[in-house]
Amino acid sequence: MDPKYQRVALNDGHFMPVLGFGSYAPPEVPRNRVVEVTKLAIEAGFRHIDSAYLYNNEEQVGLAIRSKIADGSVKREDIFYTSKLWCTFFRPQLVQPALESSLKKLQLDYVDLYLIHFPMALKPGETPLPKDENGKVMFDTVDLCAIWEAMEKCKDAGLAKSIGVSNFNRRQLEMILNNPGLKYKPVCNQVECHPYLNQSKLLDFCKSKDIVLVAHSALGTQRHKLWVDQNSPALLEDPVLCALAKKHKRSPALIALRYQLQRGVVVLAKSYNEQRIRENVQVFEFQLTSEDMKVLDDLNRNFRYVVMDFLVDHPDYPFSDEY
C-alpha cells in the first residue's frame, strides 16, 4: 500500500487517513482558489479533507472532490471528508438539518466524519458569531450530551459514517463518555496541537479511551487576525525545529508534521501554496529518531494560538482547564 494512504482504525470500525488537508482559508482568499487547491491536494496524494460549516467553503471543496471523482482520479470511498457542526446549531432539532445543509452544499450523500466544532453553544441562528447591541457574543446554554445524542442519530441515518468532537477538554469528553444513554463514543477529538502545545496529557487520555487525537494548527496556524494574536511566536521559525529540518534535509513544516505521526496523532496540514502542498505529502519518506522526538517534546510551552478570547467567559470555555 502506498505509504501516503496510511490509515488509522477508529473505534467504530471505520478508518481515517493519518495525513489530512486542512481546507480553511481566510475570507480574503477567493473562493475559486479553494476549488483549485483542494484538487491539487487530492492530486498530490491527500485523501483526508477537513472542512466545516464555519469555513464557508463547502460548496467549493465539494466541487473539487466531485471533479476528481468524475475524472477517475479517485472514488468517493477513497476520500475521507470531515465537516463540523457550528455552535449556533446546538439544539437537538437543529443538528441533522445543519448536516443536511452541509451535504447539500457539498452535493455528497454522506460525510465520513461529523464533529462538534467547539463545546460552546451560541445563540441559534444563521449568524456564526451572534452579537448583542454592545458587540458582545451571545451565548446559549445547552446539555452537550443532548447534542451528542443528535449526532448519534446522524450516524444512524447514514449521513455521517463516524462522529466525533473538536476542541473538547478532558472533562467535556468524560461527560459525553459517561452519558448513561451513550450509543457511540466519539471517534476522535480534533484539537490544536504542535510542538509548542503538544497536548501530551490529553493525548494519553484519548489513547486510554480509544479516541484518536487529530491535530489542527499543526504548523502553528496561518495567524489570521480574528483568531490569533499577531505577536505570537512563529513556530516554523523556531531554531530547534529549523536545526532538525537541516539535519534531515526537510522543511521545518515536515518535521512538525512527522512529529505528530510518530506520536500516533492524525495530523492536518493547511497550505494554499502548491509547492508546499506537494511537499507535505513527503512526511512519509523519512523518520525522526527517538532523540529527535525528545528534543521536539522539550519545545512544549503549552502555548495556544487559537485562544478564542472573545468566548473566554462562556461557561463551557474549554481552555481554562489544564487539559
UniProtKB/Swiss-Prot annotation:
GO molecular function terms attached to this record: 5-alpha-androstane-3-beta,17-beta-diol dehydrogenase (NADP+) activity; androstan-3-alpha,17-beta-diol dehydrogenase (NAD+) activity; androsterone dehydrogenase [NAD(P)+] activity; chlordecone reductase activity; estradiol 17-beta-dehydrogenase [NAD(P)+] activity; testosterone 17-beta-dehydrogenase (NADP+) activity; testosterone dehydrogenase (NAD+) activity
InterPro entries named in the record: AKR (IPR020471), AKR1C (IPR044482), Aldo/ket_reductase_CS (IPR018170), NADP_OxRdtase_dom (IPR023210), NADP_OxRdtase_dom_sf (IPR036812)
Site for Lowers pKa of active site Tyr, residues: K84
Site (Important for substrate specificity): L54
Stored PROSITE patterns: ALDOKETO_REDUCTASE_1, ALDOKETO_REDUCTASE_2, ALDOKETO_REDUCTASE_3
Binding site for NADP(+): 20-24, 50, 166-167, 190, 216-221, 270-280
Keywords of the record: Cytoplasm, Lipid metabolism, NADP, Oxidoreductase
GO BP annotations, alphabetical order: lipid metabolic process
Keyword NADP assigned: yes
Main location: cytoplasm
Location(s) in or outside the cell: Cytoplasm, Cytosol
Pathway: Steroid metabolism
EC number of this enzyme: 1.1.1.-, 1.1.1.209, 1.1.1.210, 1.1.1.51
Pfam families: Aldo_ket_red (PF00248)
Residue sites binding substrate per the record: H117
SUPFAM superfamilies found in the cross-reference section: NAD(P)-linked oxidoreductase
Active site positions, chain numbering: Y55 (proton donor)
Tissue and organ expression note: High expression in liver. Also expressed in kidney.
Catalysed reactions, as listed in the record: chlordecone alcohol + NADP(+) = chlordecone + NADPH + H(+); a 3alpha-hydroxysteroid + NADP(+) = a 3-oxosteroid + NADPH + H(+); a 3alpha-hydroxysteroid + NAD(+) = a 3-oxosteroid + NADH + H(+); 5alpha-androstane-3alpha,17beta-diol + NADP(+) = 17beta-hydroxy-5alpha-androstan-3-one + NADPH + H(+)
Enzyme class: oxidoreductase
Regulation of protein activity: Potently inhibited by benzbromarone, 3',3'',5',5''-tetrabromophenolphthalein (TBPP) and o-cresolphthalein.
Oligomer status and interactors: Monomer.
Family of this protein: Belongs to the aldo/keto reductase family.
Designated name of the protein: Aldo-keto reductase family 1 member C4
Lineage of the species this protein comes from: Eukaryota, Metazoa, Chordata, Craniata, Vertebrata
